[in-house]
From Swiss-Prot:
<dbReference type="InterPro" id="IPR027417">
    <property type="entry name" value="P-loop_NTPase"/>
</dbReference>
<dbReference type="InterPro" id="IPR036388">
    <property type="entry name" value="WH-like_DNA-bd_sf"/>
</dbReference>
<feature type="binding site">
    <location>
        <position position="38"/>
    </location>
    <ligand>
        <name>ATP</name>
    </ligand>
</feature>
<keyword id="KW-0547">Nucleotide-binding</keyword>
<feature type="binding site">
    <location>
        <position position="328"/>
    </location>
    <ligand>
        <name>DNA</name>
    </ligand>
</feature>
<dbReference type="Pfam" id="PF05496">
    <property type="entry name" value="RuvB_N"/>
</dbReference>
<dbReference type="InterPro" id="IPR004605">
    <property type="entry name" value="DNA_helicase_Holl-junc_RuvB"/>
</dbReference>
<keyword id="KW-0234">DNA repair</keyword>
<dbReference type="GO" id="GO:0048476">
    <property type="term" value="C:Holliday junction resolvase complex"/>
</dbReference>
<comment type="function">
    <text>The RuvA-RuvB-RuvC complex processes Holliday junction (HJ) DNA during genetic recombination and DNA repair, while the RuvA-RuvB complex plays an important role in the rescue of blocked DNA replication forks via replication fork reversal (RFR). RuvA specifically binds to HJ cruciform DNA, conferring on it an open structure. The RuvB hexamer acts as an ATP-dependent pump, pulling dsDNA into and through the RuvAB complex. RuvB forms 2 homohexamers on either side of HJ DNA bound by 1 or 2 RuvA tetramers; 4 subunits per hexamer contact DNA at a time.</text>
</comment>
<comment type="similarity">
    <text>Belongs to the RuvB family.</text>
</comment>
<dbReference type="InterPro" id="IPR008824">
    <property type="entry name" value="RuvB-like_N"/>
</dbReference>
<feature type="binding site">
    <location>
        <begin position="146"/>
        <end position="148"/>
    </location>
    <ligand>
        <name>ATP</name>
    </ligand>
</feature>
<feature type="binding site">
    <location>
        <position position="333"/>
    </location>
    <ligand>
        <name>DNA</name>
    </ligand>
</feature>
<keyword id="KW-0233">DNA recombination</keyword>
<feature type="region of interest" description="Disordered">
    <location>
        <begin position="1"/>
        <end position="38"/>
    </location>
</feature>
<keyword id="KW-0238">DNA-binding</keyword>
Length: 354
């Protein structure tokens, strides 16, 4: 056993069972500068998503060979998998300028009209969280996507007139974490939809190794795999955990990350071997120890761990369900055999997954 495995480190102070923000797949302000340096610049550099990369290579290559703008592209999938990066790569592969905005920023049709009227021929317009666009802006987008023109209403009341405005041919790339919330008319106007999938440990290990090389971090292969295995299948989380482990290694190990250093660092930052944090484990313990494994309603669970129901439902549950530790049933949440064993208890007969 190494010195790092024998040493006990004090866990960072937390309030209640609050989530470790390093495990939040959503982008945070602290990601921006580092993410920019780590983003791949081409489809060849992009790690993972082999099916999407192959499909996009054909879609973009076909458009280039014909000398036309490619079909509009919808990138769907959970946060943190590289949808924004893929939009940047699409523009790069086409040799086009990229204009970026988000659904929530397009509150009025006029907001979208101003952006569309400033596009140059061949530009790529990226709309993140496109499912959150206001309806007036979305309806204007229909005509822009199909006919490359928009109708602008001038005036009010009976005297209002509609003025058609031609816009330059462009390619729209939309990103959504909730494809089911897209309206049918909007979804149907995308010529190609790419479904981004969670990463396996092998691809995430490559992500960590590549990021370490760019950041100048001295890391062993098994340490990269250790970080990858706790990253919830999400590159954004893997890159964050690498930075936390690097901080630990700089202070405690002369900057060299071995697997022992990685494990010790992740213990300090409260990320266990399954990628669970304090809040995830609190939910499991509330299910198992407080309610015999369930079923339990989300409001009761939230009360037990001192969090809002939306936090339990939107932050904890997706990964716990995907990890096979929680099952959602019509009667409530149920702990599986894997959840019982994760906290060191033997599941009773009849437990899901036994």
């Amino acid at each position: 056993m190494s010195d790092f495995e024998r040493t006990e480190f004090e866990l960072p102070p937390g309030v209640g069972h609050s989530q470790n923000e390093d495990l939040n797949p959503q982008q945070t302000a602290g990601d921006s500068d580092i993410d920019t340096s780590l983003r791949p610049k081409s489809l060849d550099e992009f790690i993972g998503q082999p099916k999407v990369r192959t499909q996009l290579d054909l879609v973009l290559g076909g458009a280039r060979s014909r000398g036309v703008a490619p079909d509009h592209v919808l990138l769907a999938g959970p946060p943190g998998l590289g949808k924004t990066t893929m939009a940047m790569i699409i523009a790069q592969e086409l040799g086009s300028s990229l204009r970026m905005t988000s659904g929530p920023a397009l509150e009025r049709a006029g907001d979208l009209a101003a952006m569309l009227s400033n596009l140059m021929e061949g530009d790529v317009l990226f709309i993140d969280e496109i499912h959150r666009m206001a309806r007036p802006a979305e309806e204007m987008l229909y005509m822009a996507m199909e006919d490359f023109r928009i109708d602008v209403i001038v005036g009010k009341g009976p005297g209002a007139t509609s003025i058609p405005i031609e816009i330059a041919p462009f390619t729209l790339v939309g990103a959504t974490t909730r494809a089911g919330m897209l309206t049918g008319p909007l979804r149907d106007r995308f010529g190609f939809t790419a479904q981004m999938e969670f990463y396996d440990t092998a691809d995430l290990t490559r992500v960590v190794t590549r990021a370490a090389g760019i950041l100048g971090v001295d890391i062993t292969g098994d340490a990269a795999a250790e970080i990858a295995s706790r990253s919830r299948g999400t590159p954004r989380i893997a890159n964050r955990l690498l930075r936390r482990v690097r901080d630990f290694a700089d202070v405690n190990a002369d900057g060299k990350i071995t697997v022992e250093v990685a494990r010790a660092a992740l213990l300090v930052f409260d990320v266990d071997e399954s990628g669970l944090d304090r809040l995830d484990r609190a939910v499991i313990e509330a299910l198992v120890k407080g309610h015999g494994g369930g079923p339990v309603g989300v409001n009761t669970l939230a009360l037990a761990v001192g969090e809002e129901p939306s936090t339990v439902e939107e932050v904890c549950e997706p990964y716990l369900v995907r990890a096979g530790m929680v099952s959602r049933t019509p009667r409530g949440r149920v702990a599986t055999a894997a959840a019982w064993r994760h906290i060191g208890l033997e599941p009773p007969e009849g437990t899901i997954g036994l």
